[in-house]
A protein has these predicted regions:
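Extracellular distal adhesion/interaction modules in secreted or cell-surface proteins
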Residues: 1-277
Length: 277
């Protein structure tokens, strides 16, 4: 007898075992065992755009703590594939490499395509160290790469996401990256990027956090009670990460004097503050 197993996926964790059954074939050879040639999933014409950068986070939020902003640092490279005829995005390939862990706390990392619904994704594949997961119970695609940055320093993750031909503006990198510290519900995001559904919202406006949740302003603090929008997470160009990592335990605006001017201007001035003039 021949046995043919069939599995179905009912949501978005892509394990294809939500409903399974098998066929028992009484007449061997009645089913063609040759795999048919699959058509290409790529559109006839493709353009792609690659962005790179470094993500840096302070793990003591909602307190500023030492505010050295180097507790979790990752380098990323994201490539967006678009149909040249329609302009729609059909695939993104993200590479993340943890560079540095300057904190004493246990921090994990994930990211969310927060402008996109689950129906905008056809599949997600992650290649890298074990322990990654896809949070299928979120309203937007959310990928957790690791729970403890210390164990994966220098190891690369490659995430390939096949999309259902979506507006590229909905999947602009670096999306909504975040760390979570100690527990999954203590998330730290970049300025004005929203928490996921798993975050503990009661932490806002405690200690040094001055978020205005009703206005959609998240994860900020103040400098001397005056300069607002002091971040707990940053997206930087590719720089010598050693400059930031070496400032362990020292406030970032003491290591980089032009940092405050950059924050105060809303990012329009002192754009090269990280060059430490």
């Amino acid at each position: 007898d021949q046995i043919v197993a069939i599995g179905f996926e009912d949501k978005s964790d892509f394990d294809y075992c939500d409903a399974t059954f098998y066929l028992k074939i009484a007449n061997p050879g009645s089913i063609d065992t040759e795999t048919p040639e699959l058509p290409s999933v790529d559109p006839p014409s493709t353009v792609n755009n690659t962005t790179t950068g470094i993500l840096a986070f302070e793990d003591l939020w909602p307190s500023r703590g030492d505010y050295d902003m180097n507790d979790v640092m990752l380098e990323y490279k994201s490539t967006l594939y678009q149909n040249a005829l329609t302009g729609k995005a059909y695939r993104i390939v993200d590479e993340f490499t943890p560079l540095h862990n300057g904190g004493s706390l246990t921090s994990g990392f994930g990211y969310q395509l927060y402008k996109l619904g689950q129906d905008g994704v056809r599949s997600i594949q992650v290649d890298g160290p074990a322990g990654w997961k896809i949070e299928a119970d979120q309203s937007s695609p959310t990928i957790i790469l690791f729970d403890n940055v210390r164990s994966v320093i220098g190891q690369k993750y490659t995430v390939t996401i096949e999309l259902n031909d979506v507006d590229p503006k909905l999947v602009a990198s670096p999306y909504n990256p975040f760390i979570f510290v100690g527990n999954r519900d203590k998330e730290v995001h970049m300025v004005n990027y929203p928490p996921t559904a798993k975050a503990d919202k009661e932490l806002f406006n405690t200690h040094d956090d001055v978020s205005n949740v009703s206005a959609g302003i998240y994860y900020i603090s103040r400098y001397k009670g005056e300069v607002e929008l002091m971040p707990f997470g940053m997206n930087l160009p590719i720089i010598d990460s050693k400059l930031l990592a070496d400032g362990e335990g020292v406030k970032i605006y003491e290591t980089f004097p032009n940092f405050i001017g950059w924050v105060q201007s809303g990012g329009t001035k002192n754009k090269d503050w990280y060059k430490k003039k």
